[in-house]
Regions:
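Bacterial Sec-dependent N-terminal signal peptides
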Residues: 1-32
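Short, low-complexity N-terminal intrinsically disordered segments enriched in polar/charged residues
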Residues: 21-62, 162
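A solvent-exposed, acidic/Ser-Thr-rich amphipathic alpha-helical stretch
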Residues: 35, 40, 56-114, 121
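Polar/charged side chains located within well-ordered beta-strands of beta-rich proteins
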Residues: 45, 69, 90, 104, ...
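A short, structured loop/turn motif at beta-sheet edges
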Residues: 107-115, 129, 142-148
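Generic short beta-strand segments
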Residues: 119-125
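Sequence/structural signature of outer-membrane beta-barrel proteins
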Residues: 125-127, 159-160
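Short beta-strand edge/turn micro-motifs at domain boundaries
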Residues: 134-161
Length: 162
């Protein structure tokens, strides 16, 4: 009888140990194509530049409704409407022959690819292709309705202060 109890307890102990030590099979993580996302972000920047250079900033679909843009020497622009108004005021005050371009340097993608931080370089040139303003920027994109939109952005000129 004692032998049966000992065997039963030993069996119960071993089964409990096996259940406790059994590691769950993890599902393979979805493969995120960082280069493809970088191309997608660069395409958004190219579209933004083309729209801005055309003088039609009000049709920019780049920003989330709750976006915030941090500019140098200014209070943050809160909301898509305020950002577009700021961009329109810049278009009105700039030389119409100036053109802006953006280059995506790096992207940092979240594990689920729903957020992307972009680090890039911008350049504004005049009609003779001479740079009049250059600098760097960071943008936090979030995926909403299947598309990346800018939620937060900031930029800094690397031109000397005049």
């Amino acid at each position: 009888m004692k032998n049966k109890v000992t065997k039963g307890l030993l069996f119960l102990y071993l089964v409990s140990l096996m259940i406790a030590c059994n590691t769950k099979k993890s599902e393979p993580a979805a493969v995120i194509d960082v280069e493809q996302i970088k191309k997608e972000i660069q395409a958004k920047e190219d579209e933004f530049a083309a729209t801005y250079n055309s003088g039609e900033a009000k049709s920019i679909g780049y920003y989330a409704d709750d976006a915030i843009s941090f500019s140098q020497n200014a209070a943050p622009h809160v909301g898509k409407t305020a950002i577009v108004e700021y961009l329109m005021s810049n278009i009105d005050s700039l030389n119409k022959s100036n053109e802006i371009s953006f280059t995506t340097k790096e992207v940092f993608v979240s594990n689920d690819a729903n957020q992307v931080v972009e680090i890039g370089y911008y350049k504004v040139v005049d009609a003779t292709n001479t740079p009049v303003n250059t600098g760097n920027y960071m943008v936090l994109f979030v995926k909403r309705d299947g598309k990346y939109v800018s939620l937060r952005e900031m930029s800094a000129s690397d031109m000397p202060v005049e």
